[in-house]
Amino acid sequence: MENLSKLESIVELYFSKKYKLYKPQDANGEDLGKWFEFESRAHFLDAYLNYYRNLPNLKSAIVNGCSAKFKILYESQEYELKHNHQEEFKDEKGNLRGVNNSVLSSMAVKLTFKTTQLEAAESFDDVYRIVKSAKVSGFGELSIYDAAIRISVFLGFKPTKVFLHAGTRVGAKYLEDKGLLPEDSSQEDTLELSDFPEPTQKLDAMQLENFLCSFKNDLIKI
């Protein structure tokens, strides 16, 4: 019961704790050096995906979905940003990390040839499968999921299962270690919402994926 109570408190933070995002550059590499503050992680997820939801056509959703570029209105000004999952950056040792722009562009070009298939998609799972089939080298599982989410939002689809990858898998492992997820479930590619304990049931599958990664450092403390 104590673990469930702690988890419930962390879930509440997903909707109530302010989220601050620093962007040294905009989506086009121009110096920006600005902090953005959102009401919560849940609010940021909705605000960022709202850009893709309102794009004029599927091709623009594919191109922007792969490039991770999005526009957001903040303090009465519009900014074009790039999602940090696909940003290129130098780590503490000076090594270049992230996804190169040439990889993102190649993925967008390749996926554009599958526009007809995407138009015929009937679910997030369909979109995810199509995006994955167009994978280019350097465009990893997290980028595949992110692109599928962005394109699916435009098409009106949402995942019904929780996809595990990178930090999301780490968050799931912490819940598993506390007996809040079935044994070895963190090794699966996807989990059903019903696999998760009651405190997380107020999250949909997309939010829960986001929560597991964003709050993994809190989950380890349960």
Q: Which functions belong to the PLM regions below?
A:
Residues 1-102, 106:
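Domain-scale selection of a single, long terminal region
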Residues 86-137:
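Helix-hairpin-helix/helix-loop-helix acidic hairpins
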Residues 61-68, 133-137, 200, 205:
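Generic low-polarity alpha-helical segments
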Residues 65, 69-73, 131, 151-152, ...:
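Generic structural signal for hydrophobic core residues of well-folded globular domains
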Residues 1-50, 117-128, 145-222:
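C-terminal accessory module of base-excision DNA glycosylases/AP lyases that mediates lesion recognition
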